[in-house]
Amino acid sequence: MNFYTYARHYGDKILVRGVKDGKRFISKHNFRPTLFVKSDKPSKYKSIYGENVSPIQFESNKEATAFYDRYKDVSNFPIFGQDYYGYQYITEKYPGPVEWDAKKCKIYSIDIETTSENGFPNVDSPTEKMLVITMQDNNTKKITTFGVGEFTPTDNVKGLDIDYIACKDEYTLLSKFLEWWEQNCPDIITGWNSALFDIPYLLARTERILGEGEHKRYSPFELVNKRKVRFAAGREMTAFEITGVAQLDYLDLYKKFTYVTRESYKLDFIAETELGKNKLESGFDTFKEFYEKDWNRFVEYNIIDTVIVDELEDKMKLVELAMTMAYDAKCNYNDVFSAVRTWDSFCLLYTSDAADE
């Protein structure tokens, strides 16, 4: 069984993660992309308008990009073809239906907890300390939790397979977690609002505490891109693109694929609606009191939030749906959030198949 879990072009390389002959791999490939221009000669290749076009294969991604940039604004010289070369690579290297298996992928849910000395944590000014990080493997159900204190499980988390790593301070917590991440690097990371809170705050705080550039280690290719994304009412928030790791925020999946409008999208409300269960109550007036006065329950609160997202996936299969759509279109998992990218990939797939007939 051979399938990709991630593919994109970067410079002159195609960066790829996947499974080959049942084993996981990570690699960088040279690739010769193809673009098309109008032709006066008969050709099996056609534009979307039915015009004859001829292929130009380039020696590298950079050469193709330079050609495109040189002629893109020239009148009467249209350039055809997919300029996102990762899609070209996928279509060429994985012809026919992609046979994939989610059980061979590393799919994790994540939840973090921080201090709240100065209100809600701010990704752009990550001054609140990391207290707890939990990851759950969707396939094995193994839970790995890192916390700055000792922890003894109670009946609140009875039956869960928990590996708790007690850390003496935040520096140790982030160091140990990052080492663990590198050894178990996800193909897909999900959580509730994880793309706009858990992941960006984790990376921002890692860089502040462990040192400049250390957050790049979350990428198997050591490539991380910080960017601003539009949120509600035109507000901008900071997010991080982790090259090689797909972020499928379960809140975003739920909003996109359930086709219902909920009166609230808080995790507690969705958990009660979909699973008939709730988050663990703190029993304190403030979050600060919670982690200061009942550390054990605080850790369980974090673990249960992580498990709820995993249980939502077990019931609703929205991550699996996103994977199915991505493999049908032969694009990356994250691309399913963009109708344009998904349809671009479908169009490339359709025209490639038509040219081969």
List the model feature ranges, each with a label.
Residues 118, 196-201:
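Short catalytic/ligand-binding loop motif for oxyanion handling, primarily in non-cytosolic enzymes
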Residues 2-44, 93-188:
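Conserved RNase H-like, two-metal-ion catalytic cores of nucleic-acid enzymes
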Residues 45-108, 112-117:
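Long, highly charged low-complexity segments
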Residues 285-352:
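Common nucleic-acid-contacting/processivity interface regions adjacent to the catalytic cores
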Residues 353-357:
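A short, hydrophobic C-terminal helix/tail in secreted or cell-surface proteins
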Residues 142-148, 152-164, 168, 185, ...:
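Active-site-proximal helix-loop-helix substrate-binding element of RNase H-like nuclease domains
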Residues 123-127, 200-213, 326-330, 342:
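Short secondary-structure boundary/capping segments
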